[in-house]
Amino acid sequence: MAEAARVLVLGATGTIGRATVAALCARGHEVVCYLRPGAEAAGLPKGITLRRGEIADIARAGFRGARFEALVSCMASRSGLPADARAVDHDAHVVALGAAQAAGVEHMVLLSAICVQKPMLAFQAAKLAFEARLIASGLRYSIVRPTAYFKSLSGQIARVEAGKPFLVFGDGQLTACKPISDRDLGDYLAGCLDDPWRWNRVLPIGGPGPAITPRDQAEWLFQRLGRPVKLRQVPVGMMDAIIAGLSLGGR
C-alpha cells in the first residue's frame, strides 16, 4: 500500500494514537479518526476528519458506507480489569473488524503489547484472543507488540524528586526492556501500511539502545538529579500478589 490510503483510526486521542495520526498524515494518508462522544480532540493534526460515536455504531457513524483501505487501532481498555478488557480489548475490536471487512478494508494495523507473550492478566488474554481473531479473518494484518513506553518509566520521577526512594522488585535487575518513544512507535505503526515485510506478521518492537533494568532507570534518574541512589526493594512475592489481585478484580 505504497500509495496514499484512506485510513480509519481508533484510539486517536491517546498518546500513541496521536503520534500515529501525525505519522499517517506526514505520509500523505487521508485520516479519519473515530472518537467516543465527548473525547478531547485538541492537538490532533489539522486536515483530518473527526467522526464520533459508540463502537457499536462504527459501521454507520465511522465508515458511513464509504470505502477505506486501512483500519489502524490504538484503542485499549483503561483499567485492564476483566470486564473492561473483554469489552474493549476484545469485543469492541471484533465489532470494528466486522465493520472494516464490510467497508472493503484491506489491512488492519493493531497496537497490542509485548506482555501478551506470557498472558497472566485479563487484558493480556483479551488482546491475545483478538489477535487470533484478526489473524484468522483473512484480512492483511500487522500486529505490533511494543515493549515499555518511555512514559511508563516516568511514574516514579515525582516520588524521587520528593526525596523518596525508587521502588524495585527484588534487586531491580529481574527484568529489562528497550523503551520506545511515542513518536517512534507512531511512525512504526504508520509504516506498516507501506512496508510489505510488516504485512501478516506479529511484530515485537523496542526502542534503540541496550535493554535497561529498573535499577538502571533508578541510577540514571538519581544521576540526573545529582543525588545518591536510594532504592527500596520490594519482595518479589508481592508482585505475585498484585497479579493475583488484578486477575480477580472485576470478576
Walk through the language-model features, giving the residues of each:
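N-terminal Rossmann NAD(P)H-binding glycine-rich loop of SDR-like oxidoreductase domains
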Residues: 4-29
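A conserved pocket-lining segment of Rossmann-fold NAD(P)-dependent short-chain dehydrogenase/reductase
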Residues: 159-180, 188-192, 196-200, 204
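Conserved glycine-rich Rossmann-like NAD(P)H-binding loop of the short-chain dehydrogenase/reductase
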Residues: 30-36
